């Protein structure tokens, strides 16, 4: 009897120890997962929210009014630091501006050209074939003007970042006061959506910072949406044409498929069921 009671007592103690071990292991796993999540957030930035962009989807096109407003935001806010090297004024024709409006925009810029007949360089008004000029002559000048930080070219920025549209939109609206205990280095700003949490670019969008030509209220969110749409177009200016061509091909191939099914199932059915009998005469 004593031996049996002892064995039962030892079994209960072993079961309790096993339960405590599982609890401790679960707690350690939770702490490890949380640590990994915090480290990932610090390295890659806060998880991005997902927004429904008007041009997402196989049969949806860009909002061209938003592209025009976005170009206005870029020209008045972003162009002070960021270039757009892969876009020419002619690319804006039929997308955001008429040809006359695009020419007027180009002529506002003085472009260095030449040499002329005497071998000298000269300045002339911009033309539709000219690219949109950048704010700095070279990378060194850009870094000198921005305390060592190099503002990236925005031509392909939505393709150069994971989930680019949501990233740009969240980044522009993500500036906030740092959490307690977080020290922001000099010349930097806290933005949890930027990898590392600190970014050299200050908050640029404020309500009413741009006066839209079409009278749309220039709220901070509206400006962020419009400039993000403009940058999406800058990265894929051919997207509307590509989707239209894809829709045409889908329609054409659907007709071919229907025709092929018709001929296989009905037009040629008598040929498939025909039997040839050879009666050999001996």
For each feature predicted by the language model, list its residue ranges.
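Juxtamembrane/start-of-transmembrane alpha-helix segments at the extracytoplasmic/lumenal side
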Residues: 15-22, 235-253
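Electrostatic cytochrome c docking/interface patches
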Residues: 47-72, 83-97, 102, 215, ...
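Acidic, low-complexity proline/glycine-rich segments
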Residues: 33-34, 38-53
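Juxtamembrane interface at the cytosolic side of transmembrane helices
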Residues: 242-245, 257-282
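Gly/Gly-Pro-rich "capping" loops immediately C-terminal to redox-active cysteine motifs
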Residues: 83-164, 186-214
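Extended, hydrophilic extramembrane loops/domains of integral membrane proteins
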Residues: 195, 201-236, 240
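N-terminal mitochondrial targeting presequence
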Residues: 1-40
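The canonical Cys-X-X-Cys-His
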Residues: 74-85, 227, 231
């Amino acid at each position: 009897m004593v031996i049996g009671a002892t064995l039962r007592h030892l079994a209960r103690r072993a079961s309790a120890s096993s339960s405590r071990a599982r609890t401790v292991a679960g707690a350690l796993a939770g702490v490890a997962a949380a640590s990994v999540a915090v480290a990932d957030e610090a390295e890659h930035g806060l998880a991005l929210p997902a927004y429904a962009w008007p041009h997402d989807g196989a049969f949806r096109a860009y909002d061209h009014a938003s592209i025009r407003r976005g170009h206005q935001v870029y020209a008045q806010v972003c162009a002070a630091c960021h270039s757009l090297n892969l876009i020419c004024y002619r690319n804006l024709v039929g997308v955001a501006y008429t040809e006359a409006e695009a020419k007027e925009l180009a002529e506002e810029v003085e472009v260095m050209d030449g040499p002329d007949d005497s071998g000298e360089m000269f300045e002339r008004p911009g033309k539709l074939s000219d690219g949109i000029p950048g704010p700095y002559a070279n990378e060194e000048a850009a870094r000198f003007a921005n305390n060592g930080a190099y503002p990236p070219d925005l031509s392909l920025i939505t393709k150069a970042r994971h989930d680019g549209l949501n990233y740009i939109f969240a980044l522009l609206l993500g500036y906030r006061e740092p959490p307690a205990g977080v020290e922001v280095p000099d010349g930097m700003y806290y933005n949890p959506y930027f990898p590392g949490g600190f970014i050299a670019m200050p908050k640029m969008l404020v309500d009413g910072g741009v006066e839209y030509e079409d009278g749309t209220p220039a709220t901070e969110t509206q400006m962020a949406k419009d400039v993000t749409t403009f940058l999406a177009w800058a990265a894929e200016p051919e997207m509307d044409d590509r989707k239209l061509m894809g829709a045409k091909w889908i329609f054409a191939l659907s007709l071919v498929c229907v025709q092929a099914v018709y001929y296989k199932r009905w037009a040629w059915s008598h040929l498939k069921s025909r039997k040839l009998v050879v009666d050999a005469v001996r």
